[in-house]
Amino acid sequence: MRAVPTWIDKVHDRDKVEQCIYDLAFRPDGSQLIVAAGNRVLVYDTADGTLIQPLKGHKDTVYCVAYAKDGKRFASGSADKSIIIWTSKLEGILKYTHNDSIQCVSYNPVTHQLASCSSGDFGLWSPEQKSVSKHKVSSKITCCGWTNDGQYLALGMMNGVVSIRNKNGEEKVKIERPGGSSSPVWSIAWNPSKDEHNDILAVADWGQKLSFYQLSGKQIGKDRSLTFDPCCVSFFSKGEYMVLCGSDRQAALYTRDGVRLGSIAEQNAWVWTCRVKPDSNYVVVGCQDGTIAFFQLIFSTVHGLYKDRYAYRDSMTDVIVQHLITEQKVRIKCRELVKKIAIYRSRLAIQLPEKILIYELLSDDSADMHYRVKEKICRRFECNLLVVCSQHIILCQEKRLQCLSFTALRQREWLMESLIRYIKVIGGPAGREGLLVGLKNGAILKIFVDNPFPITLLKQNTSVRCLDMSSNRSRLAVVDEHNTCLVYDIHTRELLFQEPNANSVAWNTQCEDMLCFSGGGFLNIKACSFPVHQQKLQGFVVGYNGSRIFCLHVYSMAAVEVPQSAPMYQYLERRMFQQAYNIACLGVTDSDWRDLATEALEGLDFHTAKKAFIRIRDLRYLELISSIEERKKRGETDNQLFLADVFAYQGKFHEAAKLYRRSGQDGRALSMYTDLRMFDYAKDFLGSADPKDTKLLMKKQADWAKNSREPRAAAEMYLSAGEHLKAIQIIGEHGWVDMLIDVGRRLDKAERAALSRCAVFLQQLQQHGYAAELYSKMGDLRALLQLHVHATHWDEAFSLVEKHPQFRDDVYVPYAQWLAEHDRFEEAQRAFHKAGRQAEAVRVLEQLTHNAVVESRFSDASYYYWMLSMQCLDIAREDSEQKQEMLKKFHSFQHLAELYHVYHSVHRYMSEPFSSNMPEILFNISRFLFHNLSTHTPMGISKVDTLYALAKQSKLLGAYKVSRHAFEKLQSLKIPARYQDSVELSSLTVRSKPYRDNEDLIPMCYRCSTNNPLLNNQGNSCINCRQPFIFSASSYEVLPLVEFYLDQGISDEEAVSLIDLEVPRVEKNKSWQEMSSGESQCLKLEDGPDDPEDDPFTAKLSFEQGGSVFVPVRVSRAVLRSMSRRDVLIKRWPAPLSWQYYRSLLPDVSITMCPSCFQMFHSEDYELLVLQHSCCPFCRRPIDESC
């Protein structure tokens, strides 16, 4: 850092008496300087120090001045207790007074409110206010300052206190300095930096201390001792530095943390005030003797560079190491003035005022940025240049070079014949590095650290400014004092060439033949002996690595990517392909790589071309080069043919065709033009080419017609060329049905692929008849079936299956799926069954059944369970392994079907407002259901609904005992809230009824004639003989039927034949009986009861009953012969079930049995239900369907 005086002035009054300069203030734009001198306010032009105008208005000494941030006005305060507000046009506009002399003034940077401070109070004035608000203080105010946001005002006082107040003058923070009144606070300043998170206040007191505080009053760090009484502290505009002045008669530069960096100006009297010009490096000081001195601070660049690592000084006390490739930075805080920096490999040397620090990298990683202290040399050195090596530091002092170890031992010294102008480490083994030294007299020497004797490389007539040696140390570049770049051959000391306008030079570390130099705002790149390539660039070139040029501009180092295109093209012009490739490797664009590869390929330098195409990943050309290399290995040597291939790849087709013809390869030319659809040019080569190529040409021309959106022409060309599949594809895609039919009929049936493709397109175009015609022509029955299935032409499919049963699965399975998709699930189940897909059929039925139960469609659930049972019976008949399991499921599903059939009526009674069933029927149904729910309740069936219906109908019909029992059962169940009151009320009222049942309702066993209770422990069987009751499937009354079984050895067919014999019985004489009433007479033919001995079946009933175990009725052949066919009902179950036989004991009661589900009905009920539903109410068999 150097301070250069710009101008100096000394202020006197009329009597030549020196006027003390108490305060200074800059206009915000820096163009004017306001000076408090004596009782006048002086305005200077900062450019040259001329006095613009003295301002008069005060009657006593002016102590303070301040300029508003907006530049519109400034203020001055005087010992005459007054404040004057001046405009920027130097006109006084306002004056107000305090009770004491004015000590300091300060403008708010945001609101432009003026704070004026005196010995006993301070005032706040703003342009918007007419009056000044004043606030008393306990001590004399010596200095003041606003925070950057204008929210708080700091006051420094004579008693050593710093008071921080808000805009209204209220004290918020009070800072008491340790010295108290013996250390008056003489100057304060807020750091204006925008990078700080907190407002930082610098406080200088006459206890010779400098301190820093946060806005909260918390001190930052410790007090810094000064050797003088500070009179003024002033920050630079960005807050990175500050200036202190005082009783030591000088102004000094400090860091923002209070570290002294150096002296700016030494004067002959106390320096009372100092200010920094806004946004610049100019400092002005005002002295006791009236001197006003204006200085420019010049901060020199302290830096070092080694390859891609650049170290430079920042904020005078820090060192930043920057990796120019990765852009990583690391800051090393030294907390002292950094004087010199040197960097080499992993070493970093930093010279401080009293010591040299040697740092090293933590690891050998090229990207590592972690440094640690290796050695400290605690000695003061004076030197012009500093160089560091692996184990030494080199100090340059004028003509002398000293080599010191890291322990400060002087190991070697060299004395030069002239001043040393440039020094550079050029590498070498650790401890034996070489140095390149340039002298003022033009001598250039090489010095080795371990050798006391310098080696003179050459000597020129002009002074050396910059040096660099090429990577293999064969050439030397020198920039002399006339800005000329000279390049020498080190071995012969011959001057190779020279270039003007150079201020620095650097060889490319990766290419021996390239160097760059800068000067005159241009960057110059020179390759070999070619002309220089220029481009604009500001700064000094300090390094050249590959395509990166390291350039120092003012204080910043930048790595500039410079494409090496120009030198590469210079080599290409001379067909030096390998050298051009080496240059391109340093960094060129993709288009440059392509140009290099193309030029090398045309020059038949396949090796270089291949490497260049690899760089840009051009696989097409790499394949070409690979094929050429393979052909050369096989012995091909015709370079014209190779070049023709290259031209063809490059799009130079006519040149390629000419070369093909010269080489006798007309076929290749024909193929090339054909692929390019240049059929007119291709025809020129047809005569001399292979005749087979004519057909190929037609195919290619058809392809071209297709791609050029002329499909009809393309199809016709394909047909002409025999490419039927391609022609059919085009015709089909465009939906030309007539052409498809015509092609299909013309094709031979042996061309199955073309016919099949044609049929597929006809099918897609909904022309099923023509498609069927083609499939029939091919004899493809499976495809024909699939066509019918796809078109849902089921009748044609079924008729075809009848002729070819092996395709049954191909039809019935899709048919079943189609039915299921159209919600025709029952038909789908039957179709699955026909297709032999029992598992799918059962799965469909199970899903239908589950859905019906969940949706409370219990009639449907009953029907589906019946169908499931019949499905299981079919499986049991067909699969002997699953016979027992399927028979078990059959009986279970039959039982469930009957339960859901019954519960359907109960559910309708409970959920609908009216019921179509008679009370007796509902009573029978609910009683039947109750007897079957004693052990297990199927899903969906409500026991509550069953018992409630039974209780209600029992009560209605007079079966009070049953009703009471049902209501008691209901009490143990969870009853829905809507029935709760009704159940409780009915349960009470039924207790008022007699505890008996209506005798008309009591069922009788037709085998043993025993009256059974309505609630039977045996369920739906007789309590005496255990004979199961047979119920009507509509009214659920007990039918007068008794099941009987055949004796051993009697088959079903024999039994039926015996029953059909109907042996006539001996008729007894019948008599007439007269019956008369009051108004009529009638005769009745008396038909007396048969004698049991006359009916063998009745005898079986009488003599084989009794016991606790049910004993079925078994009949012999004689008994079968005695039976009437009208009295016997037979359930003719399919195998593997046996038939069931029932004898009606009341022949006059007409009973009808459904031939499909074998359910028994009263004939009248059955006929009525069939009329209503046109089918059986249980199995839904239509009345016109034969079983």
Curated annotation (Swiss-Prot):
It comes from the Eukaryota. WD repeats lie at residues 16-54, 57-97, 99-135, 137-175, 180-223, 225-264, 266-306, 459-498. The keyword Lipid biosynthesis does not apply. PROSITE patterns: WD_REPEATS_2, WD_REPEATS_REGION. Required for cilia formation during embryonal development. Acts as a negative regulator of Shh signaling. Residues 1070-1094 are annotated as: Disordered. GO terms for cellular component: ciliary basal body; cilium; cytoplasm; intraciliary transport particle A; non-motile cilium. This is Intraflagellar transport protein 122 homolog. GO terms for biological process: camera-type eye morphogenesis; cilium assembly; heart development; intraciliary retrograde transport; intraciliary transport; melanosome transport; mesonephros development; negative regulation of smoothened signaling pathway. Keywords: Cell projection, Cilium, Cilium biogenesis/degradation, Cytoplasm, Cytoskeleton, Developmental protein, Repeat, WD repeat. The gene is ift122. The keyword Cytoplasm applies. Disruption phenotype: Reduced number of cilia in embryonal pronephric duct and shortened primary cilia in Kupffer's vesicle. Embryos show shortened body axis and curvature, cardiac edema, small eyes, pronephric cysts and a distended cranium; shh signaling is reduced. It is found in: Cell projection, Cilium; Cytoplasm, Cytoskeleton, Cilium basal body. Component of the IFT complex A (IFT-A) complex. SMART domains: WD40.
